[in-house]
Amino acid sequence: MIYEKVAEELISSSYTIAFTGAGISTASGIPDFRGPQGLWKKYSPELASIEYFEKDPKNFWGFYSLRMRGLFEAQPNKAHYSLAELEKMGIIKVIITQNIDGLHQKAGSKNVIELHGTMRRSYCVLCLRTYDSLNVLSMIEKGNLPPRCDCGGIIRPDVVLFGEPVKNIYEALSIAYESDLVISIGSSLTVYPANLIPQTVKERGGKLIILNMEETPLDSIADYVVREPVEISLPKILENVRQKILS
């Protein structure tokens, strides 16, 4: 059975990392981006670009505040909790995520690298003062659009917008360079340069496990591919790991 084999790989690995995408959070009510019901089927990606923020911050925040509210209301699902437990057991060393929802930390994960930033924090573009994004939402709900800092600068979410470089990519790639196993969870593996992380592990002689409902460009080089919702597959993997450790 594939879950037993994946569990064996995780246990025998000396340095496993998890690479997560939007698909791990869909069961939490957060739409992915490129799937059949994805966010970019309903909205133009331009709305989440640095160019649009600079050109029209008022309407940028009109879109982003709606998305932000949905992320704050979301709760971790079984996939997040299973990953946090695997980290607690020492199986997963680092979680590298493309997500900005903060659900890994909410589920109890400690060692998380956020490639695209976090929706939970915002900052002033002039003085760089940081804000809890919940407080920024309160400003917007009181009619302050776009939200402004005390210094007069416009506040923006601390996320990577289209047209901006990815955060922490070199740190993430250095970790991938040392890893002998990467488990990719809920990622389309189409977004560059983030998709270099699983590729780097494979190129260094490591193994790649893909958990994703849709096909990915890296399926052909993966050691295992599991086509099942990740909120189902990850708890099964966790249970198999527990059984093998206890036996």
UniProtKB/Swiss-Prot annotation:
Q: Which cofactors is this protein said to need? A: Zn(2+)
Pfam families per the record? SIR2
Predominantly, its location class is cytoplasm
Highest taxon of the source? Archaea
Q: What is its EC number?
A: 2.3.1.286
Where in the cell?
Answer: Cytoplasm
The catalytic residues are H116
- Residues reported in the UniProt entry to bind nicotinamide: F33, I100, D101
What reaction is this protein's catalytic activity?
Answer: N(6)-acetyl-L-lysyl-[protein] + NAD(+) + H2O = 2''-O-acetyl-ADP-D-ribose + nicotinamide + L-lysyl-[protein]
Cofactor remark: Binds 1 zinc ion per subunit.
Taken from the UniProt entry, a GO cellular component term is: cytoplasm
> Does this entry carry the keyword Zinc-finger?
no
Residues involved in Zn(2+) binding: C124, C127, C149, C151
Q: What class of enzyme is it?
A: transferase
GO MF annotation: an example: zinc ion binding
Q: Where is the Deacetylase sirtuin-type domain?
A: 1-244
UniProt keyword list: Cytoplasm, Metal-binding, NAD, Transcription, Transcription regulation, Transferase, Zinc
What does the UniProt record say this protein does?
NAD-dependent protein deacetylase which modulates the activities of several enzymes which are inactive in their acetylated form. Deacetylates the N-terminal lysine residue of albA1, the major archaeal DNA compaction protein and that, in turn, increases albA1's DNA binding affinity, thereby repressing transcription.
**PANTHER family under this entry?**
NAD-DEPENDENT PROTEIN DEACETYLASE (PTHR11085:SF11), NAD-DEPENDENT PROTEIN DEACYLASE SIRTUIN-5, MITOCHONDRIAL-RELATED (PTHR11085)
Instruction: Please give the NCBIfam families that the UniProt record associates with this protein.
Output: PRK00481.1-3 (NF001753), prot_deacyl_CobB (NF040867)
As for family, the record states:
Belongs to the sirtuin family. Class U subfamily.
Quaternary context = Monomer.
HAMAP family recorded:
Sirtuin_ClassU
The protein's name: NAD-dependent protein deacetylase
Organism (species): Saccharolobus solfataricus (strain ATCC 35092 / DSM 1617 / JCM 11322 / P2)
